[in-house]
Amino acid sequence: MGEDQTALLNSILKDINIPTARELIDLHKEFNADNYAPNRDEISKRLIAPPYRNSEENLKLKGRAGEPELRQLYINNLIKKTKFKYSVETQTGETYNHTNNNGNGRSGNIDLTIYSPESKKGDLKNLVNIEFKFCTPSAEELKRDITKLVKEKKIDGILYLSLINSNKSTIPKILEKLRKVFLPLEESKDFSKIADNKLVMIFIVVLETTYIYHNIFDFNRAKDNFDKYCEDFFVPSKFSISKIPKIKK
């Protein structure tokens, strides 16, 4: 089962994640770089990066290629390149406790859920849950997203992060935040159940540098020494790193 799950995530990486990153970069450059000719297909070109108000914090950026645009491009590629079915803002099967709900568990929403092509009413075959994040997320935001991705039983997850820019410390800091989010998961009372055959892909795209970073966290491999696995996993050298090539016409 593990090999099939890894193959599925890698096919999504190739067919959806990377093409989406390429188009998001193209959208960002179209609306923020001078004399840049967009190079997306005709469907993706119809998506516009809405203008920012002329406020001081956004003087350097003219158009937003943010989380809503990321999700739209992702769905476009899912439709164009796969047979998967999908839902948006999918209610979670589990309940979660956050600081603002008085300690009572409540359902959350998953940004996007991918189902097998054979799924139908009354017989949904959930394959992957996806959470999108734009700009550098806080530790609390990461905790909420990772909790939802991990605790939904028998469904793998993808955390898709989009950053405008980065320096040499940006990626290490994000990975360290993620390490601190993952570590307490081992103390969950139902850890053995939620982590059984669970995979979570971490995918990061940086719009200005056009680099992508990705790796798959394998809970089965992590079980024997969870602390050590987390320590070894959440470092840039363990991630596949590549520069996104330009879109070919």
Identify the meaning behind each predicted range.
Residues 1-33, 68, 249:
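Nuclease-adjacent, charged terminal/linker segments that flank catalytic cores
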Residues 5, 63-70, 105, 138-141:
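Phosphate/oxyanion-binding active-site loops and adjacent basic polyanion-contact surfaces
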Residues 35-101, 121:
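Acidic-basic catalytic patches of nuclease active cores, encompassing PD-(D/E)XK
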Residues 112-118, 125-136:
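Conserved catalytic cores of phosphodiester-cleaving nucleases, focusing on short active-site segments
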Residues 128, 154-164, 198-202:
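Hydrophobic beta-strand segments of well-ordered beta-sheets in folded domains
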Residues 135-154:
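Mg2+/Mn2+-dependent nuclease catalytic core
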Residues 164-249:
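Domain-level recognition of nuclease-like catalytic cores that cleave nucleotide substrates
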